[in-house]
Amino acid sequence: TRTINYEVPAGHAAIAPVTQTVEYTRDVNGVAGYQDPVTGEITWNPWHVKSGNAEFASAAVEQIKGYDSYVDGTKATEVPAAQVTEKDGVPQNGANVTVSYQKQGDTPVPYKPGQEGVDDDMNQYVTRTIVVHEPGKDPVSHDQTVHFTREDANGNAGYTDPVTGETTWNAWHVAGELNQANGTWAEFNAPTVKGYTASQAKVAAEEVTAETKNATIDITYAPVAPTGQNVTTKVGETPDADQGIANKGDLPDGTKYSWKTTPDVSTEGEKPATVIVTYPGGSTVEVPVTVTV
């Protein structure tokens, strides 16, 4: 006989040994041997194979997904045939065979660039959108995007385990920078608009990762607030309303000024009055002043 033993990987079900048998016999025409009538000694016929060849047949090795099989240390998928040997005319058992297994290497998953701006298993786009709302203009969006990929130095995005079929993805990094896990949204300075104050003069730079959520920031503009000042005039002379505003030069172009009620300049004295400031967008602000006549 020859026995094929299987050494399976940990966690795998055992594979039963396979025993190969080559049957020999002494039978020749129904006679196994002859006995000497004088001495009584029996002379046996030589052993010979009962049928077939005097060899252990080749045998296919049972395969395990994700592993390479080895026969007595040599990578192979079948146990080779082996001649039966004899010693002093007696057929001998064949050498036992050991089948072992080695796990195959992980299968590379090639990196694919994908579609610009579209997230997938291999690409991640992290975007900050800054929307600038300048007065009298359509909003303008400024996109700041950091592209992250999983591509390694070998052009692969990950590796698939041949046994489980699970893919382990490479860590995210900034596209083109293998060792840079973090990217940056750059600092953004809001446009300066005469007569208006931005809701924020700048948007600070920010470090981001592939897990950072997309963000949208709106920058709006409010007109500069008017500052009132007292006005001096002569009896009978009504001053222009804009004289009651100290910071006209800081206000938006096209701002208009009017008296809420025309001040009484018919007599001397300090007369309370109100200047109505009308911005280009139509909003108004009332500014209390004193008119000295």
Regions found by a protein language model. Give the residues of each.
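C-terminal edge beta-strand
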Residues: 285-293
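Short, solvent-exposed loop/edge segments of extracellular or virion-exposed proteins
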Residues: 3-33, 38-42, 74-79, 111-116, ...
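Short, solvent-exposed loop/turn segments enriched in Ser/Thr/Gly
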Residues: 124-127, 237-243, 266-273
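Surface-exposed interfaces of beta-sheet-rich extracellular modules
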Residues: 44-88, 169-207, 257
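Solvent-exposed, low-complexity, repeat-rich "mucin-like" stalks and linkers
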Residues: 39-55, 164-184, 224-253
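Conserved "repeat-terminator" motif of extracellular CCP/Sushi domains
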Residues: 1-7, 78-127, 132-133, 205-225
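Core beta-strand segments of extracellular beta-sandwich domains
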Residues: 58-63, 99, 187-192, 219, ...
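Serine/threonine-rich, repeat-prone extracellular segments and beta-strand-based repeat modules
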Residues: 72-98, 199-218, 251-285
